């Protein structure tokens, strides 16, 4: 009798296990929501690093006067002379 029972269980196992798993999953799902209670209010999303950086850059730009810029000639004086003036003729 036992070998026949095991053969039947082995043959029809997929048809038996899916409904059992479905019922166990549904009961567990509803039990979890019952224990957890009300859903919490969604937390306001925090700004990403890129958004915070853009906000900081915009705040920095608001305080500057963009009409006052350094001329390109003055910027060249700050470059290391050993590298950039190696192949240039000396200034007179």
From Swiss-Prot:
Compartments in which it is found: Membrane
Keyword NADP: no
Keyword terms, alphabetized: Membrane, Transmembrane, Transmembrane helix
Membrane topology: Single-pass membrane protein
Primary residence: membrane
Residues spanning the membrane: 15-34
The family this protein is said to belong to: Belongs to the SMIM12 family.
Stated name of the protein: Small integral membrane protein 12
Organism: Mus musculus
């Amino acid at each position: 009798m036992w070998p026949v029972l095991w053969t039947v269980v082995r043959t029809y196992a997929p048809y038996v296990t899916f409904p059992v798993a479905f019922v166990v999953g549904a009961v567990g799902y509803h039990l979890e929501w019952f224990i957890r209670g009300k859903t919490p209010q969604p937390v306001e999303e925090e700004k990403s690093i890129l958004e915070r950086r853009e906000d900081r850059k915009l705040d920095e730009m608001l305080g500057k006067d963009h009409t006052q810029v350094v001329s390109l000639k003055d910027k060249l004086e700050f470059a290391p002379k050993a590298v950039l003036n190696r192949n240039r003729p000396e200034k007179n």
